[in-house]
């Protein structure tokens, strides 16, 4: 788990080949936030195929409104109503380790697609088209990992030093961790928004966020 030396080298290759929109000095300086790389033991769990949609959010919050979404099948985003949603859901948030494990789907590259620069056409924010959703799935059958800013159970700590070796969330006071967000900035403005699609990219929650529910494996 974390941003590896090989992944940093892959970003440098993209930059040297004029694949970056701007100087990536700030990205490399902030890479410490996703390091050091460590091995994490992740127990089996269930995770939603994609973030909650507007229609799904209204199942739990009937009064939910979303001025950002274009349709009921679009990703729902929460801000002031996040705590209400989490109180109503019979599920939990993924830990940060679970989220990255799900996003990587067995890979160690920048995204599950490889070390190439992600394109904006890989962003998925609406799930009405089953064919398009299926084509966006990773090897675990998960779609839109990295497209929306997705909140995790962990509190934000700007590094992985002394982080647990299992997938438990790190707790405490302060904002939570968010992962992804490439679609929240669409249409892209040439500001290297593609970096938000990387499996290892992490940040602290500031405004609205999407939710991808998680549940334990059922017992027999």
List where the protein language model places each region.
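Functional-site microenvironments in short loops/helix caps that host divalent-cation chemistry
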Residues: 66-195, 207
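Small-residue (glycine/proline)-centered packing/hinge motifs flanked by hydrophobic/aromatic residues
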Residues: 15, 25, 189, 193-200
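Active-site microenvironments of metalloenzymes and redox enzymes
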Residues: 2-118, 155-157, 216-219
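Short secondary-structure boundary/capping segments
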Residues: 32, 37-39, 167-170, 202-203
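Beta-loop motif signature
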Residues: 1-2, 194
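Short, structured beta-strand segments at or near domain termini in extracellular proteins/domains
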Residues: 206-220
């Amino acid at each position: 788990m974390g941003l590896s030396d090989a992944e940093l080298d892959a970003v440098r290759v993209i930059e040297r080949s004029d694949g970056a929109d701007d100087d990536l000095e700030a990205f490399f300086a902030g890479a410490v936030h996703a390091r050091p790389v460590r091995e994490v033991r992740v127990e089996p769990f269930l995770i939603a195929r994609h973030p909650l949609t507007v229609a799904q959010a209204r199942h739990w919050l009937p009064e939910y409104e979303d001025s950002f979404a274009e349709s009921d099948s679009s990703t729902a985003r929460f801000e002031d109503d996040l705590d209400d949603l989490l109180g109503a859901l019979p599920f939990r948030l993924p830990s940060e380790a679970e989220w990255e494990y799900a996003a990587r789907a067995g890979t160690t590259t920048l995204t599950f697609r490889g070390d190439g620069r992600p394109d904006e056409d890989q962003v998925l924010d609406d799930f009405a088209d089953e064919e398009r959703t299926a084509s966006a799935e990773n090897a675990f059958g998960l779609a839109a990992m990295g497209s929306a800013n997705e909140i995790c159970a962990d509190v934000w700590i700007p590094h992985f030093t002394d982080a647990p070796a299992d997938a438990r969330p790190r707790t405490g006071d302060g904002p939570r961790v968010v992962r992804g967000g490439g679609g929240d900035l669409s249409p892209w403005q040439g500001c290297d928004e593609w970096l938000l699609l990387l499996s290892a990219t992490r940040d602290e929650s500031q405004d609205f966020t999407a939710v991808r529910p998680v549940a334990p494996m059922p017992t027999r």
